[in-house]
A protein has these predicted regions:
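Short, acidic loop-to-helix structural element flanking the phosphoryl-transfer center
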Residues: 150-179, 186-187
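C-terminal cap/substrate-recognition subdomain and adjoining C-terminal extension
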Residues: 33-34, 38-40, 53, 87, ...
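Non-catalytic pre-domain segments flanking phosphatase-related domains
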Residues: 2-7, 11-14, 19-122
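Surface-exposed acidic, glycine-flexible loop patches that form ligand/cofactor-binding
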Residues: 103-114, 169-170, 228-231, 247-248
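Surface-exposed alpha-helical segments enriched in charged/polar residues
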Residues: 95-98, 166-169, 194-197, 227
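Short acidic, Gly/Ser-rich segments with clustered Asp/Glu that frequently serve as metal-coordination loops
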Residues: 125-133, 246-247
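Metal-dependent phosphoesterase signature
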Residues: 129-130, 135-160
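Sec/Tat-exported extracytoplasmic proteins
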Residues: 93-104, 128, 132, 171-175, ...
Length: 266
């Protein structure tokens, strides 16, 4: 993974956020979804659906960190609320994509993506697979440790996020093409794809890993990949990820932001 900022961080105030954005604490008691980004130039005017703001907008500057006290709060959120929030976002993605695919192809049930060229884009880390336990067990909890994460990736010790697997499998059953777009490096490609396949998420039409030589931000690279897919004739509906950089600058129809209170990738 290419992490520009990875820190102890919980959104506690809208002071740090773009004033056009809706911000709530991710420790909310309900798991409702709503439009967390609206008419933002960073999203190409596309809506992003989530259960909260997560971390600062890409327009924020500098290192955003709240200090080293929130470990207990992060664990509390993970143990009591995260699963419900993940389920809500995934359910929203399934419901929206079902309606979008039917209207796009003008058919009520099963689709044939070879005719309609419908596609969904998925991030990997903390979207399809969870790195929470890796971060928790880091020498300094929730501070990124590249060696530990690489070992977990190589051994497939990153558990599946079940609601996203459900969405992935639903899209496949409807004939929607699935593409993997991840900041993981190319030398992690084989381990990652083998792990995803073992978790029941396979038959993707393409998998894109960030090249070592690419020096721009994750948001710029992922946008370029989506644009290449569009240029190849794919109609991208949902873009699903845990970072706004998974759905920045457009080239998708609707974004779905999985909850992540641990780190921020620009």
């Amino acid at each position: 993974m290419f992490l520009q900022i990875r820190s102890f961080a919980i959104v506690t105030s809208a002071v740090f956020l773009n004033p056009l954005l809706i911000a709530i604490s991710p420790l909310s008691s309900s798991a409702r979804t709503f439009q967390v980004y609206k008419d933002d130039k960073l999203t190409g005017g596309r809506a992003i659906i989530g259960t909260g703001q997560n971390l600062p907008a890409l327009s924020s500057s500098g290192v955003w960190a709240i200090g080293n006290f929130p470990k207990e709060e992060i664990e509390k959120y993970h143990n009591k609320q995260a699963a419900a929030d993940q389920q809500s976002v995934a359910d929203a993605a399934i419901a929206w994509t079902n309606q979008w695919s039917q209207s796009r192809c003008n058919v009520p049930k099963s689709l044939d993506f070879s005719q309609c060229r419908l596609a969904a884009v998925f991030d990997v880390d903390d979207t399809m697979l969870s790195s929470y336990v890796v971060d928790l067990n880091s020498p300094v909890p929730f501070v990124h440790n590249g060696k530990l994460l690489n070992n977990a990736i190589e051994s497939c010790k990153t558990p599946v996020i079940e609601p996203v697997r459900k969405a992935y499998q639903a899209f496949r059953s409807w004939g929607i093409a699935t593409f993997i777009v991840t900041g993981r490096s190319k030398n992690q490609r084989k381990s990652t794809l083998n792990c995803l396949e073992s978790m029941g998420m396979s038959e993707w039409e393409g998998a894109h890993f960030k090249p070592h030589e690419y020096k721009c931000s994750a948001s710029q690279w992922k946008y370029q990949v989506r644009q290449l897919l569009i240029n190849d004739g794919w109609n991208i509906g949902p873009s699903i990820g845990d970072q706004v950089s998974d759905m920045s600058y457009g080239s998708f129809t609707r974004g779905f932001l999985m909850p992540n209170v641990r780190y921020f990738i620009k």
